[in-house]
Every structure is written in structure tokens, then in C-alpha cells.
Amino acid sequence: MKNLDFAYKSRKKTFPVLEDISVRIRGAQLVSILGPNGVGKSTLIHCMNRILDPTAGAVTINGYDVDGISIKDLAKFMGYVPYSSVDNFPLSVTDTVLMGRHPHSKWGTLDDDLRIVHEMLCLIGIEDLADRNFNELSAGQHQKVMLARGLAQEPRIMFLDEPTSNLDIKYQLEITKMLRRLSREKNMMVIMISHDINIAAKYSDNIIMMHDGGIFALGKPADVITSENIKHVYDVDAKVIMDEGRPHIIMIDDDDTNYDDDHEFSVIATKSGETYKGP
């Protein structure tokens, strides 16, 4: 990207979102985009994958402007997993993931497409959902299915907008670790928006930290995730410690209220129907 700008426009006013963003990302790696709400993270990846057209500047792949690449060819090259699926698919999970093969299809569904779909379902650990109706699944299951669909495209670049937001901590770690592994195994660039700084720091090769519509810092996690940067971008105090060469943040509570453990509590109803009073 070079000198990228984007603004939403109404009849009377322009609302700038991104201003003069220039960054070059190379090779198979996991890149996490961090920053508070409203700084333009989703807009940035939407400009990268041509969902939105920049107001100014250009996005290039291997020297080619994405504007000159057909949508179908671009879909062979780029995959995208949105923040949450609002799509209504009256389809089975298998058929939903099979939609990811569309950019590669010629005349109907081939055995190779079905094989790849099955591999992706097994990779994400949802093969037991293969025959379930997509619309009957939970939010977390939706997210896994959409991730499998994106991977079924076999893209060279994968964009993900908070891919673990509806998952519990076990699957957040597993999915993020898997994305880093896939970047190596499939020679794929993975660009992921995240709000979990510690998970991003643990697994990312590089970090882009955004603030006020621009890139505030970029580079290795240890160089980007510092107490000073966290304070400037998020306006919170944090202590950063190093764990096996990776930064880990600990929030500093400036509330000077003293708490003790001498608090009574009660559970009104338990599974057995009895009332339990705490210590």
C-alpha cells in the first residue's frame, strides 16, 4: 500500500477514516492489526481486498494494482473471513464451505473440491457438523465454518476480522496458533485484526498498531507492544514483561480502593435446588 486514504462521503460532508497509509508486507507470515475501536482497522483490510475503493493511493500485489485484477482472479488469490457472519445460508455446513471453492470451479463440483472441503472441516475440527444446517449453529460454530470456507479458497493472502471473537480461550489460542502454522505450511500471508493484545503478541510475526486513522507503530511484537505505545494508543496504563522473547501486558489499575476477601455471597439456586451461602 502506498499513500492510502479512505473517507466515507455524504451529500454534505466527508468523514476521513484512513489517512496516508503506506506499508509493505512480504512473505508468508502472520500479521496482526491492533488498535482501539473506530481507528479504521476493518476499513484498512477492506481497502486491501477491494471490498472498498480507496479515496487515494494504491494497493498492489507483486507490483500489480488490485484495481486491474478481476474479482474472480482476486478471489483465487485473497480469502476473507468477516468479523461475524450475518449471512443466511439455508445450506449444510459442507455446502457452505464448498462456496469457498467457487473461484476455482469450472463445471460443477469436482471430487477435488469435496476433498479440500473435508480437509478444511477436519483442520478446524468441525467435521462432525458437516451435515448440520448452517443457520442452526451457534455464533462460535458460525465463525469456525466461515474460517473453513475462507481456507477452502486456498488463497495466498488471508484476511480475517477478529476471527476468534466468539470463541472461548481454548479455541482462541488453537485457531491463532493454527493460522501461524498454516502461514508456513501453505506459504500464505495471514493478516488478522485482533483485540487480544497478548494473543497477538504471542503468535504474530509482525504487528501493525493503528491510531486515529493511521499506522502508529509497526514491526516485531517486542518493538511495537510497549508500555508507552499502549498508553498512547489505548490510553491505559500497562506493564509489559517479556516471556520467552515475547511481550506480555499486565494492566495497571489506578483505582486506589482497597479490597478485602471478607465479603459474604450466596447462590440462590443450585443444581440440586438447595441454597448455598458462601464463606
Label the model's feature ranges.
Residues L34-P36:
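The feature captures the beta-strand-to-loop junction immediately N-terminal to the Walker
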Residues N49:
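Helix-to-loop junction immediately C-terminal to a conserved catalytic motif
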Residues G57-D65, L74:
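Conserved ABC transporter NBD signature motif
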Residues L98, D111-L129, E154:
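Conserved ABC ATPase "signature" region
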Residues N133-L137, Q141:
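Conserved ABC ATPase signature
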Residues M158-E162:
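Catalytic Walker B motif of ABC-type/P-loop ATPase nucleotide-binding domains
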Residues V233-P279:
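ABC ATPase nucleotide-binding domains
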